[in-house]
Design a protein with these regions (language model features):
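N-terminal Rossmann-like dinucleotide-binding module
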Residues: 1-49
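Beta-loop-alpha module in the N-terminal Rossmann-like domain of NAD(P)-dependent dehydrogenases
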Residues: 19, 49-96
Length: 96
């Protein structure tokens, strides 16, 4: 049985938008959406790609299996550790 991975992005900037677009086009991947501390930015990136804008990190982590952390660097560690603690596969944009 083939598993569809639910993927999402933390951070709605340039890098987050790039990762979101790549997830949305991959076969075997369902693009869940984007979490950003500014929900309107998350919506701007997620909605055209068929994803949701998440207003809180916990809800976002409940909706994904795989996450890219592409937020400002000062938030990387905390967000990545939260995703790891939630059992998610995590890719962190540099710097880690």
């Amino acid at each position: 049985m083939t598993q569809t991975l639910r993927a999402g992005v933390i951070g709605a900037g340039v890098f987050g938008g790039y990762h979101a677009a790549q997830y949305a086009r991959l076969s075997g991947v369902s693009f869940s959406g984007v979490y950003d501390t500014h929900p309107n930015r998350a919506a701007r990136v997620a909605m055209p790609l068929g994803g949701r804008a998440f207003a809180d990190l916990e809800s976002f982590l409940g909706a994904v299996d795989v996450v890219t952390v592409a937020s400002p660097a000062s938030h990387h560690a905390g967000q990545a550790l939260a995703a790891i603690a939630a059992g998610k596969a995590v890719y962190v944009e540099k710097p880690i």
